[in-house]
A protein has these predicted regions:
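Non-globular, low-confidence helical/coil segments that flank catalytic cores
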Residues: 1-207
């Protein structure tokens, strides 16, 4: 209905308006159409990706976008060749695209379990990811080793440990790991950030 009304108004404007009015009208319509796709303030969204959550941080106008974990689903009843069933295509990916996101400034993987990082390849295929952040030592986890290296050609990979600070609007403080691990639960990347006096503590599956 709304789309039909918009088309009618555009046609009416083309017939009756002067050139200057047409330009102003089209600019106004573009703002009307595109503005709802971009956050007007810092937004934090917890996306249900199945067994776990994916947390999305968006600054004003999507100038900066950070994603913590991708989710992932393991099908224990399938053959080994089809063991991992990707579900990002109907959970996280539609959410990000619906928010007008095309580039992710930082993608954090808290640890190597599939329910936290199993869909990372799908995200790397669908979006431009500037930096992939993992806990120090996690690159040796088998689930990381199995990832397609071709997907990382345009993405920097950075290992983090306690004391590191990354990101802009918001900035994330790394509280753990204290030492190099192997990407297991006990080695989870723990992040803290503050947005408008609200403190967020993201702990992965830290034991």
């Amino acid at each position: 209905l709304w789309f039909g009304i918009v088309i009618f108004l555009v046609g009416l404007a083309c017939v009756t308006a002067t050139q200057t009015h047409r330009i102003l009208f089209f600019v106004s319509m573009m703002v009307f159409i595109l503005l709802p796709r971009f956050p007007l303030k810092t937004a934090v969204s917890f996306v249900d990706v199945g067994q776990g959550d994916s947390i999305v941080f968006q600054s004003f106008g999507n100038q900066k976008v950070y994603v913590v974990d991708t989710g992932g689903k393991v099908n224990f009843y399938a053959n080994d060749s089809d063991k991992v069933t990707k579900n990002a295509e109907y959970t996280l990916i539609p959410f990000l695209k619906g928010e007008g996101i095309r580039q992710i400034d930082g993608l954090f993987l808290t640890h190597g379990d599939f329910d936290h990082m199993g869909d990372v390849e799908e995200i790397l295929r669908e979006f431009s990811v500037e930096t992939l952040y993992v806990a120090e030592g996690m690159l040796h986890h088998q689930n990381m080793v199995n990832l397609d290296p071709k997907l990382f050609k345009q993405t920097a990979v950075v290992e983090l440990r306690q004391g590191d600070r990354v990101g802009v609007h918001p900035t994330f403080e790394v509280l753990s790991p204290f030492e190099k691990g192997t990407g297991e639960n006990k080695d989870s990347l723990v992040l803290a950030t503050v947005i408008k006096e609200v403190r967020f503590l993201l702990m992965g599956d830290l034991e």
